[in-house]
Swiss-Prot record:
One of its GO terms (cellular component) is spliceosomal complex. Residues 1-19 have a biased composition (Polar residues). GO terms for molecular function: enzyme binding; pre-mRNA 3'-splice site binding; zinc ion binding. It is found in: Nucleus. InterPro entries: Slu7_dom, Splicing_factor_SLU7, Znf_CCHC, Znf_CCHC_sf. Participates in the second catalytic step of pre-mRNA splicing, when the free hydroxyl group of exon I attacks the 3'-splice site to generate spliced mRNA and the excised lariat intron. Residues 21-41, 465-479, 513-533, 588-606 have a biased composition (Basic and acidic residues). Residues 1-44, 193-212, 465-620 are annotated as: Disordered. Belongs to the SLU7 family. GO terms for biological process: mRNA splicing, via spliceosome; RNA splicing. The lineage of its organism: Eukaryota, Metazoa, Ecdysozoa, Nematoda, Chromadorea. Keywords: Metal-binding, mRNA processing, mRNA splicing, Nucleus, Spliceosome, Zinc, Zinc-finger. This is Pre-mRNA-splicing factor SLU7. It comes from Caenorhabditis elegans.
Length: 647
């Protein structure tokens, strides 16, 4: 601000008859500008506040330093920028506080405006805390209470409201000091009395001179020194570092010594590692690395790992940004984990038992003597004594379905389980007894037996046809036997000729040739047997077609007849029962394959069969639908049946 210009209202300008058209000349404006620059540079003196007498900063802009027209002033001033005294809130001084323990004087006569009940000034009858009197003080003028003391209305600031020492009188601490001094004097008197009676020996130094108990009294007020006043002999406790103490970074002055971090004042590695003759120092200080694994470090690391696992599982939790949330989640997780573990353990114990073994008996019972005698051999088996009771299964026992005499799983061969009584590998299949075992063993050895030796001939096949088939088989066997005999005669002739030519023993090539010849014969028999089986099946299909055609014709012919008990009706009923039995056999076979695929854990029930014995139709249907393991097409037929019923 270069110069002061009085800012007057229009009314004052009119009274003073100031001409508004008068303006400063160019030279005056230039002079004021130069003066302003000099004041800012410090070469010219600054303007002085007419009210406070202090210099006005020349760098203050004019719109701030110039007082408005409604604030009159005699010269340059900054009073308009400072807070107004009449608007300032007067705060309570530090020595002002509520008076405590005040008692007013009681009057002898009732005064106007006092409480009608107790007679004290300061409150009315409806606000009186005294017990309502039967005869109040206004009527009796007796036993008038003391007047109420009106506490001052203190205006406290932010810090004054939160000052814990507000209203404290330091002079009250003198009473505490005096109490301690009286206790100390009483202690000295009691100690002198005990020393005179000989109950306590006087304290002495190492040289035998009497020890001065007040030798550290002057140092008791020093920082870091505390005197134990309660013990019989005073002990000075110094928590400051002594001068002979060596800093961490001075233990090892080698160039490759462990690094000392001055910011955290830590040396993680051991400075005496590999230094001979420093075993005692290494025992006192071996580095600060142990701090990294002490305290809450392990818990913090576990929380961090839990946060990673929770985030991977879809629950976002940050160990640094949300520590409270992470701790709550971890507590809830540990609680649910322990609850689930206990529930699972309880379910297993309820299902299988053995809860009495989970609790450890007392040591007196474990180490006590018993009367039960048990003797073991070198292999750990019980020779004498009570053996362990076999654990009973939760499955039903002694139930053999489908005419079996053993359970499924009692026989094992080539990676498959089966029945021991008949060597069958299909579960819920009908038992074939010893014939099934013979067929299975012959198939395993390479020799085969016909189906007629294993299964009985169905009733639908006529006896004459069976006889014809047997005669054909016998004729084929005779032909094969003749061929074999011819081959044997030829071989004998060759052997005789070879013997006559060379009496040397047969070579390995001849033995291999004999084995190949046997294999060719076995293969030939197998092919012939397969051909006979195919011919039988073809004939069987033709007979079925012929019977179906006859049955249809009989149905057409019997529509006009009224007799329901004819022979065709009985045959149709038997055929219907046969079809139902065939469907049932196929359904049971499909269910058995499904159960075998699902396994013991997958299926719902362990027993899904009926205990009733099968009738003749069901047995016949089982024989018709069953595929023997010796059949070369057995694998193909089983796979085809499985594909058909798994769609």
């Amino acid at each position: 601000m270069a110069s002061y210009k009085q800012n007057l209202p229009p009314s004052a300008l009119i009274k003073q008859q100031v001409n508004v058209a008068d303006k400063k000349s160019k030279a005056e404006v230039q002079r004021d500008r130069q003066l302003e620059e000099d004041r800012k540079a410090g070469t010219a003196p600054a303007m002085v506040d007419v009210q406070t007498g202090r210099d006005i900063n020349p760098h203050i802009p004019m719109f701030i330093s110039q007082n408005p027209w409604y604030v009159p002033s005699e010269g340059p001033t900054l009073k308009h920028q400072r807070p107004h005294e009449e608007r300032e809130k007067k705060m309570t001084q530090i020595h002002e506080w509520y008076q405590k323990g005040t008692t007013g004087k009681s009057a002898t006569k009732f005064r106007k405006g006092a409480c009608e009940n107790c007679g004290a000034m300061g409150h009315q009858k409806r606000d009186c805390f005294d017990r309502p009197r039967k005869s109040n003080a206004k009527e009796t003028n007796d036993n008038i209470a003391e007047d109420d003391y009106v506490q001052p209305n203190l205006t406290l600031g932010f810090d004054a409201k939160r000052d814990r020492w507000n209203g404290y009188d330091p002079s009250t601490h003198k009473q505490v000091i005096e109490d301690y001094e009286h206790l100390e004097e009483a202690r000295k008197v009691v100690r002198e009395h005990e020393m005179k009676e000989g109950e306590v020996e006087p304290a002495t130094t190492e040289d035998g001179a009497p020890k001065d108990e007040d030798m550290y009294a002057e140092d008791a007020d020093m920082a870091g020194v505390s005197v134990d006043m309660d013990s019989r002999t005073r002990i000075t406790v110094r928590n400051l570092r002594i001068r002979e103490d060596t800093a961490k970074y001075l233990y090892n002055l080698a160039e490759n010594s462990p690094y000392y971090d001055p910011k955290s004042r830590s040396m993680r590695e051991n400075p005496f590692a590999g230094v001979a003759g420093k075993e005692l120092e290494a025992a006192r200080f071996s580095g600060d690395n142990f701090v990294r694994y002490s305290g809450e470090v392990t818990a913090a690391n576990e929380a961090q790992v839990f946060a990673w696992q929770a985030t991977r599982g879809g629950v976002y939790a940050h160990s640094i940004a949300e520590p409270t949330k992470l701790e709550a989640l971890k507590k809830e997780y540990e609680k649910e984990k322990s609850t689930l573990k206990n529930e699972t353990q309880k379910e297993l114990l309820d299902k299988y038992g053995g809860g009495e073994h989970m609790e450890r008996p007392a040591d007196e019972l474990l180490l006590a003597q018993t009367e039960s005698y048990i003797e073991y051999n070198r292999k750990g088996k019980v020779i004498k004594g009570k053996e362990k009771v076999a654990i009973s299964s939760r499955f039903k026992e002694d139930i053999y379905p489908q005419n079996h005499t053993s359970v499924f799983g009692s026989f094992w061969r080539e990676g498959r389980w089966g029945y021991k009584c008949c060597h069958q590998f299909v579960k819920n299949s009908y038992c074939t007894g010893k014939q099934g075992i013979e067929a299975e063993t012959s198939a395993a050895k390479g020799t085969t037996t016909s189906n007629e030796e294993i299964f009985k001939v169905p009733k639908l096949v006529e006896k004459t046809e069976v006889k014809e088939e047997k005669e054909k088989e016998d004729s084929i066997k005779d032909e094969v036997a003749e061929e074999n005999s011819d081959n044997d005669n030829d071989e004998e002739k060759e052997k005789v000729s070879e013997k006559s030519i060379s009496p040397s023993p047969p070579s390995d090539d001849e033995e291999k040739e004999k084995e190949r010849e046997k294999e060719r014969l076995i293969e030939k028999e197998r092919r012939e047997r397969d051909q006979r089986r195919r011919d039988k099946k073809r004939e069987k299909r033709e007979r079925k077609k012929a019977k179906l055609g006859k049955r249809k014709r009989r149905h057409r012919d019997s529509d006009d007849e009224s007799d329901p008990s004819s022979g065709s009706g009985s045959e149709s009923d038997s055929d219907e029962e046969m079809r139902k039995a065939m469907k049932k056999a196929k359904r049971e076979k499909a269910e058995g394959m499904k159960a075998a695929r699902e396994g013991d854990r997958g299926r719902k029930y362990n027993t899904d069969y009926s205990n009733t014995a099968p009738n003749e139709k069901e047995m016949e249907a089982y024989r018709v639908t069953s595929v023997h393991s010796a059949d070369p097409m057995a694998a193909y037929m089983n796979s085809k049946f499985e594909k058909k019923h798994t769609k």
